[in-house]
Amino acid sequence: MNKPVHNNEHRRKRFNKKCPFVSAGWKTIDYKDTETLKKFITERGKILPRRITGVSSRFQGTLTLAIKRARHIGLLPFVAED
């Protein structure tokens, strides 16, 4: 009978994340820039999703490709180093 009018406890505030590559004016992502690529990889070696990083869909694809290229060449590890 006594239901709360608004249950805001479980709602999260949404805000638009700006793509770091668009705001910095990047045209492409270089696979040799390992310091930038490491920011978008977890400590386990997984690529972070767009909803966490805020990267646009265009740059998420190029970022994924750059990370995979860097892994195949040996610039980035495939898995975490224990």
From Swiss-Prot:
Entry GO MF terms: small ribosomal subunit rRNA binding; structural constituent of ribosome
* SUPFAM superfamilies per UniProt: Ribosomal protein S18
Q: Name one GO cellular component term.
A: cytosolic small ribosomal subunit
Give the signal peptide range.
none
Superkingdom to which the source organism belongs: Bacteria
InterPro entries reported in the protein's UniProt record: Ribosomal_bS18 (IPR001648), Ribosomal_bS18_CS (IPR018275), Ribosomal_bS18_sf (IPR036870)
One record GO biological process: translation
Swiss-Prot/TrEMBL keywords? Ribonucleoprotein, Ribosomal protein, RNA-binding, rRNA-binding
Q: What does this protein do, in the record's words? A: Binds as a heterodimer with protein bS6 to the central domain of the 16S rRNA, where it helps stabilize the platform of the 30S subunit.
Subunit structure as annotated in this protein's UniProt entry: Part of the 30S ribosomal subunit. Forms a tight heterodimer with protein bS6.
Q: Which family does it belong to?
A: Belongs to the bacterial ribosomal protein bS18 family.
Q: What NCBIfam families does its record include?
A: S18
Q: Any idea what this protein is called?
A: Small ribosomal subunit protein bS18
